[in-house]
């Protein structure tokens, strides 16, 4: 029996519609999650089309077996329980070397945040965990209690962009010298105590950026996204498209940079023609990110920081 898996899909129609679905095409949902994007994408396919859906969380896959049951019966969907950084390898094992489109919904899913024992949220008391793949070895407890001061400062600055990273790392170092820091509440209170009073009056939870930083470190989120998106670009067939939803500046910056590198070429100006092997493989479909509508923002608080970028394969 699976737990309730409530998840409101962000930018649902925009993400899938921008893939310009071919009814008999081969598609990938790199981040199955609540299966919202998968369900809508499958509704656009004929019996000749197929979807490969990745997720490293078994709970998400169990839920999707219920939500997508009618498509499973027709043999239109294949679930792959793995990190999407293994995209190319896992698809190759299934005989897939080219795809017509792929979508990503990066970051942690709402059900993972809401499931207290997963330890993702600073709003609920739970053991420090934060693993998207529950079989992974590194946990938030390991990071908080075993990383030295300099490594803590590094990840807090790099992944949390918190200007009080040094003070927070020092406070953690002092606290764990007395006893291990074991819960999300303990950590959140330590973070609050390291920040000046005027900072605590600002909008947003004072622990948000540090929790984000630890979560990214535990799951190597940016490294996995970097590897996977590059593989996806390579896998795309001509005119195939890639849609990526991001939820914070680090993810968006990474996606924007990868798309830029794949859609521009470094050749001298004035060349009479550009050889095929030097042509950029991608073309940006939207120069600026697509944002949620006002209606969606009012209906789904999680959508507030969402940005969608889309690109198309124009050269192999």
Curated annotation (Swiss-Prot):
SUPFAM superfamilies: Putative methyltransferase TM0872, insert domain, S-adenosyl-L-methionine-dependent methyltransferases
Any one GO BP annotation for this protein: rRNA base methylation
InterPro entries: RsmH, SAM-dep_MeTrfase_MraW_recog, SAM-dependent_MTases_sf
Pfam family, one: Methyltransf_5
EC identifiers of the protein: 2.1.1.199
Methyltransferase listed as a keyword: yes
Residues holding S-adenosyl-L-methionine: 35-37, 55, 84, 105, 112
Keywords: Cytoplasm, Methyltransferase, rRNA processing, S-adenosyl-L-methionine, Transferase
Molecular function terms from GO: rRNA (cytosine-N4-)-methyltransferase activity
GO cellular component: cytoplasm
Catalytic reactions on record: cytidine(1402) in 16S rRNA + S-adenosyl-L-methionine = N(4)-methylcytidine(1402) in 16S rRNA + S-adenosyl-L-homocysteine + H(+)
Domain of life assignment: Bacteria
Location(s), subcellular: Cytoplasm
HAMAP family documented for this protein: 16SrRNA_methyltr_H
Functional description taken from the UniProt entry: Specifically methylates the N4 position of cytidine in position 1402 (C1402) of 16S rRNA.
Similarity comment: Belongs to the methyltransferase superfamily. RsmH family.
Name under which the protein is recorded: Ribosomal RNA small subunit methyltransferase H
Organism: Streptococcus suis (strain BM407)
Gene (UniProt): rsmH
